[in-house]
Amino acid sequence: MPRGTGYLRARIRHLVVTRAADRLTLGILGRRHRAQEIALREVELRVPGWPASRDGLRIAHLSDFHLGDLMPVGRAVEAVERIARRRPDLVACTGDVVDLDVDGCEPLLEAMGAVQAPFGRFLVLGNHDHLHDAAELVAMAEVHGLRVPHGQVMRAGDAADPLLVGGVDWGRTVRELDRAVDVLPAVPDLLLAHNPKAFHAAARRGIPLTLSGHTHGGQVAFPGRPRANLSFAHRLSAGHYRRRDCALFVNVGAGAWFPLRLHCAPEVVLLTVRRG
C-alpha cells in the first residue's frame, strides 16, 4: 500500500517515544491507558446562527480514535456502539481514525456506518489518516455508508429542507484551512474539519457550527480546567468556543498518541444543538 509523506517520521516517533515509554514502565502505562473507559459525554450546545428547523438536532461527535497499539479496534467499536444506542440524528467523525496503518480499521468504519442516524454519517480525514493510505480508508468508509465531504457541501435529512454539511480535508496551517473553507461551493450549516484552526475562516464565512478534533485536549490538563492543557500549538483546544453567531466544538478525542491522559478523559460526545 502507498505511504504518505511523514509515515517514516511518525513510525520512528512511535517507536522511540510511545513504545519506549511503555517499555520503561514495564507496560504499566499502556495497560492503564487501554483499560481507561472512553467517556460518553453529553453536551447541549447553543448556537445563535443554527437553523431554527434543526433545533435540538443530536450529533454523535467522534474523533481521534488512533487505532493501533494504544487503541484496540474492539475498544473503539464498543464506544461507537454505546453512543449509537442513544439514537443520534447524525454521526460526525472528525478524523484520525487510525494512528499509522489503515490495516484493521474496517470494523470501526463498519460500526460507524451501522449507526441508524436519519441525517447520515459523515467523516473527514485527519493528519494521521494520510500517513499510510488515505484513499483506501476513504474507499472503505464509503463502502460502509460514510459520506466524506472533502471540499464539498452535502445535503442531509429532509430533501425539502436539508441540513447542509460541509467538510475540509486535513490542513496544518490557518492559511491552508482558510483557502479550503473559502472555496467551499456553499455556506454549510455544519462544517467538519479535523484541525480547529479552520474555525477562523468558518466564522468569517458565517458557518453556524464547526466540529473539530486533533488537539486531544493536550492529553494532560489542570483539574477542572480543560482548556489549561499541554496543547500549546492550539488556542482552540477543548470544548466550546463562540465567535459572533458561530460556534466551534473541539472533541478531545477517544484515543491518544502517547499512553497518558491526565484530567482529560478520552471521549465520544453526544451534542444536542440548540438555536440561541
Q: At which residue positions do the language-model features occur?
A:
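Acidic, histidine-bearing metal-coordination/catalytic regions of metal-dependent phosphoesterases
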Residues: 1-58, 69
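Active-site-proximal beta-strand elements of phosphoester/diester hydrolases
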Residues: 56-66, 162-171, 190-194, 247-253
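Conserved beta-sheet core of the metallophosphoesterase superfamily
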Residues: 196-275
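Beta-strand-turn-beta hairpins that frame and shape the catalytic cleft
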Residues: 38, 47-60, 146-147, 153-166, ...
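Active-site neighborhood of phospho(di)ester-bond hydrolases with catalytic His/Asp-centered motifs
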Residues: 60-63, 90-96, 120-127, 149-152, ...
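Binuclear metal-dependent hydrolase catalytic cores centered on His/Asp/Glu-rich metal-binding motifs
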Residues: 139, 143-146, 152, 158-193, ...
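Solvent-exposed loop/turn segments at secondary-structure junctions
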Residues: 97-99, 127-131, 154, 171-173, ...
